[in-house]
Every structure is written in structure tokens, then in C-alpha cells.
Design a protein with these regions (language model features):
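Bacterial Sec-dependent N-terminal signal peptides
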Residues: 1-27
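Pepsin/retropepsin-fold aspartyl endopeptidases
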Residues: 18-386
Length: 386
């Protein structure tokens, strides 16, 4: 199970990220590891690691990143909600901030959110760059070569019936359940989520609530607090003219927040999006798709029944599948992992560790839970079949 970046929804506020100057450039390098990471300079000198998130309207900065780099701004308190069942207080920076996404791509923001991103998403994130970041001209996300490429041609691509509304992009998606029924409608295109998620309004649908092969999970939802739901094997999903087969969908059971919103059916995350090269044209309000070499390759790691959140000194259990071996062995949400296979976690690169995991790998975990220290051994068994 992979970590999930929250979707931020602001109350009575609209964030903007505007262009300072646009000089022709072919592409910008990104890093793709379930999320899209950008190298960003703040105020022309301070390097930051930002997530490119089309589910977010503006720009956000991590509060610790600001404090460590002496970024002192005028702020006011705001309320935000997101994936999960609660709201939090954050800061709205009212000063103008300049960002550089390459030597030739400058932006500025006049309304920037500042919040504790590292405690919600992980120690490596310094900020979020939202949907308007590159909206001034057509661009293509290439998940394979890990680039954002500015282009002038859509030759070889298929148009999808996209809807641009209130700084969000919606695409039609049809999900085919194992009982033959279809759930179809508009889903938000969200590069800030590593998962495609069906909103909780549809949990009671025939073929979902009564599916015998679904698996319940518990997860941290970022800004909105804990976010729970089920993993559900489905026959296929149709996106435009393209059919993606044998998928594991996520179905939310949240009662509040973005995943309980009745105005759209769910979100399309990177687990589906990374099967394609995707062209965005915000001026014409159009989206084009072309399958890449990952198309319909089963990338699901169906043994990852636990997910970790890296604080630096320890890993926090940020997600777990109920009745998986990890759960049966006693691992619980918010457990603090101190050592893995006799190696302190501060000496382990979490991303590489997770990427290298294989089915049936054995883990020896040293855990701190409140004032107790626990040792557990387990195998990463496959917990669900697509």
C-alpha cells in the first residue's frame, strides 16, 4: 500500500499562481515515485522539493521549510479540509513569493498556503505546485522519461472529453465491477494522489459493499485526518477509448472531506495516469492521451499491506490492511518503526526500501508504541488478487 497525498479544499479562498515571465523552454525534469516531484527555487536561491498536484489550485509551502530557510512572511489563519474526516488551521501567506521551476520558468504567487506538510506527507516534501503552475501553454507529462515537455502538436494522441471547472479537471471514467455492473461519471484528474479512488457515496453500490474479495484498510489522510476504505478488485476501467484491465480500485468510506463529495465520483490518480503520456491545454480546456510502455502492465504490489511515513528518526505506520499478516502479527496505525532487519531506519532510504520489496520478503521490526517496545517478525504475503 502506498502513501497518499491529500487533496486540499479551501473554504471561501481561491489561490493563484501566476506567470512572472515565460521564456521558451523545451522541458523540465521531474522525479516520479508515485508522485511527481519538481525541483523549485524559492526567492531565486532556496532549493525545494515540490509535488506537482493538479488537485490543488495554488502553491503551498511547508512551515518547517520556511523556518529553516528564514522565509518570514505576513500571514493570517485559515481553515482547510481534505481527504479525511476533519479540518485544520493553516496559514495564508499574503506576501508575493517568487518561484523558479527552471532557469527560464519563473512564477509568482500572491496567496500561498503554509502548513505542516512534512508531518502529513513526509520529510522530503517542501511544497506543492498546483494546477495553474504550467497552465500558460500546452505541456505533456511523460511518466516514463520523467519530464514535463512543452509541445505544439497532439499528433498520435486521442482527445478525452475533459471538463475544466473551478481550477479542477474532470475526466469521464467507467469502472466495470466483477458482477458486470458499471459505475461511470466524472472523476477529478489528480496527480497529487497515487491512487484512483471512488468516493464514499458509492460504497453501498451493488458489487462493492457486498463484494467478498474487498479488503479494508486504515490510512493517514493528510490534512483531513485519518481516511479509511477498501481495496476492491475490478474487471476494468474505461478512460476515453482506452481499457485498463484487472485493476485494484480504492473505495472510500469517509463521511466528510474530499472523498465524500457528491459533486464528482472520485479521483483518478497516478496509478492509472502513469499508463499514459498526457497533454494538457488549459487555454483550450482539452486533454489528450497516448498509452506509454507501462500501459496495462500490472504494477500493483499486492503484498504491500503496510505503508510507512518517514520522519527521519523513525518510520510511522501510515496505512495497514485489516486481516493482512502484518495486522494479524500485531502492527497497528501510528506504531513507530525504529529498526528494520536490525538496521536503524534513519540509515535506510525509505523510497528505495519500499521499491525493492518483493512478495514473501521477511521483515524483522523493532517498534515503539507509546511507552512499550515490541519486536515483530512477518512475511509480506499477497493480501489481494487483481
Amino acid at each position: 500500500m502506498k502513501k497518499k497525498l491529500f487533496l486540499l479544499i479551501m473554504s471561501s479562498l481561491s489561490f493563484g499562481s501566476c506567470s512572472k515571465k515565460i521564456t521558451p523552454i523545451d522541458s523540465i525534469s521531474i522525479r516520479y515515485n508515485n508522485h511527481l516531484y519538481l525541483n523549485v527555487n524559492v526567492k531565486d536561491k532556496i532549493h525545494g522539493n515540490f509535488i506537482f498536484d493538479t488537485g490543488w489550485n495554488g502553491v503551498s509551502l511547508d512551515s518547517l521549510f520556511c523556518n529553516k530557510n528564514g522565509l518570514d512572511y505576513k500571514t493570517k489563519d485559515i481553515k482547510i479540509s481534505g481527504i479525511g474526516n476533519s479540518t485544520r488551521t493553516a496559514k495564508l501567506i499574503t506576501d508575493t513569493i517568487h518561484f523558479k521551476f527552471s532557469e527560464k520558468e519563473d512564477r509568482f504567487s500572491t496567496s500561498t498556503a503554509m502548513l505542516d506538510l512534512k508531518s502529513m506527507v513526509g520529510k522530503t516534501i517542501d511544497g506543492i505546485a498546483g494546477i495553474q503552475t504550467f497552465a500558460q501553454k500546452p505541456y505533456m507529462i511523460d511518466y516514463v522519461s520523467q519530464k514535463i515537455i512543452f509541445i505544439n502538436s497532439v499528433k498520435g494522441y486521442e482527445s478525452v472529453n475533459a471538463q475544466f471547472e473551478d481550477y479542477k479537471i474532470y475526466l469521464p471514467l467507467s469502472i466495470i465491477l466483477k458482477n458486470g455492473k458499471k459505475i461511470q461519471g466524472k472523476f477529478m484528474l489528480d496527480t497529487g494522489s497515487d491512487q484512483t479512488i471512488l468516493n464514499s457515496n458509492f460504497f453501498m453500490s451493488d458489487g462493492i459493499h457486498n463484494a467478498t474479495d474487498k479488503k479494508k484498510f486504515f490510512a493517514k489522510g493528510g490534512v483531513g485526518g485519518d481516511s479509511n476504505g477498501y481495496f476492491l478488485p475490478v474487471v476494468a476501467a474505461d478512460l476515453g477509448k482506452f481499457k485498463l484491465k484487472k485493476l485494484i480500485m480504492t473505495v472510500s468510506t469517509d463521511t466528510l472531506g474530499a472523498l465524500a463529495n457528491p459533486n464528482y465520483m472520485g479521483i483518478i490518480g497516478n496509478d492509472l495516469l502513469d499508463d499514459f503520456n498526457i497533454i494538457f491545454d488549459h487555454q483550450k480546456e482539452k486533454i489528450w492521451l497516448k498509452p506509454n510502455k507501462n500501459f496495462n502492465r500490472n504494477k500493483n504490489k499486492l503484498f504491500r499491506s503496510i505503508s510507512f511515513f518517514d520522519t527521519g528518526e523513525k518510520w510511522i505506520i501510515a496505512g495497514i490492511v485489516e486481516n493482512s499478516e502484518a495486522y494479524r502479527k500485531g502492527i497497528r496505525m501510528n506504531d513507530q518503526i525504529i529498526e528494520v532487519n536490525n538496521v536503524p531506519v534513519e540509515k535506510i532510504d525509505l523510497d528505495k526500501f519500499v521499491e525493492d520489496l518483493k512478495a514473501n520478503d521477511s521483515l524483522h521490526l523493532r517498534i515503539k508504541r507509546e511507552d512499550k517496545k515490541i519486536e515483530l517478525k512477518l512475511k509480506l504475503n499477497v493480501f489481494i488478487k487483481s
